[in-house]
């Protein structure tokens, strides 16, 4: 097949994952690929000339982020325009600490999600303060535990994926993934969560049990004007906003904002939330397995461990029905014949030739892109553009010769 990623460029995909063994050039490849897509317009009949810039978001899912280093620009947990490509390319680095802090502290302390203090009746302030302090301490312990919880990196990344499923404001998302083990756990998450939800919801009495637990927690927060009663109906009344004609000014907001009302959960709400999550999981899983929307680009080097891990990755992707027909082989020692012989270069070329032959045999129906080893670091948009050129044009040492990706000083 064509030894380039040109077909990928014109496939009108929504998600592209770039992954492989650690240290093989995944970040450089994903950044170059994002730059290539961002500089390639897409068809749009409503735009002047029939085309417009493609809106690309590059997301690092690796706990050890390198996007900032690759672009010579600091990125955070929110999309930030890439300098020089502000109209078409943004990047972000998912931070599990931000995810666990926001998810836990908003629900386990006495503050609202917008950060303002809860408004309570004066007579209940002391009691509420005592219980709020207790729950704040519990929240701090849980937050610290969540930060070190196995799989939290994958869960935080998956939370970002869910967010962009619901609000897809970009034409393409490119994921610079963690090394193979992390990535496989991430890709398995929809299937795992679906199975877990099915097992949990099949347990008789689970929803009423959660409802009872929420009432117990609410009652332990103190008697704040009867926000939670003994039945689901009283709980629903506490969480519902009273009508203006039947409530005194400020009374309704106090009840609605009370700790009890935040902890009251009905069995129907449990089932509704579980159903909503399952539907979202199914949507993500459907996108993962749709070759017209999602593709995976494997990155490797021509060495035994990398080739072995790439084959394992390809087999796992097939198990999850995730499309993968592109492999980028980095760091190849490719020299023009006019160059003087080099003992070290010849030794490396001999090793690489053996594994390139295996790659060609294993992946004859893949787009195998062979990228040269460069003497300079690929950093910054200009260097990434030069590197990206050979993702859509096969590199030839005789034709292209020595490649300078960095501008001379």
Swiss-Prot record:
Q: Which GO terms describe its cellular component?
A: GET complex
Give the EC number(s) listed in the UniProt record: 3.6.-.-
Primary location recorded for the protein, binned into one broad class = cytoplasm
- Which SUPFAM superfamilies does the annotation name? P-loop containing nucleoside triphosphate hydrolases (SSF52540)
The signal peptide, as residue positions, is: none
Record carries keyword Metal-binding: yes
Top-level class of the enzyme under EC nomenclature: hydrolase
- InterPro entries the UniProt entry points to: Anion-transp_ATPase-like_dom, ATPase_ArsA/GET3, ATPase_ArsA/GET3_euk, P-loop_NTPase
* Enzyme active site: 62
- GO molecular function annotation: ATP binding; ATP hydrolysis activity; metal ion binding
Protein purpose: ATPase required for the post-translational delivery of tail-anchored (TA) proteins to the endoplasmic reticulum. Recognizes and selectively binds the transmembrane domain of TA proteins in the cytosol. This complex then targets to the endoplasmic reticulum by membrane-bound receptors, where the tail-anchored protein is released for insertion. This process is regulated by ATP binding and hydrolysis. ATP binding drives the homodimer towards the closed dimer state, facilitating recognition of newly synthesized TA membrane proteins. ATP hydrolysis is required for insertion.
Similarity-based family: Belongs to the arsA ATPase family.
The name of this protein is: ATPase ASNA1 homolog
Q: Which organism is it from?
A: Leishmania infantum
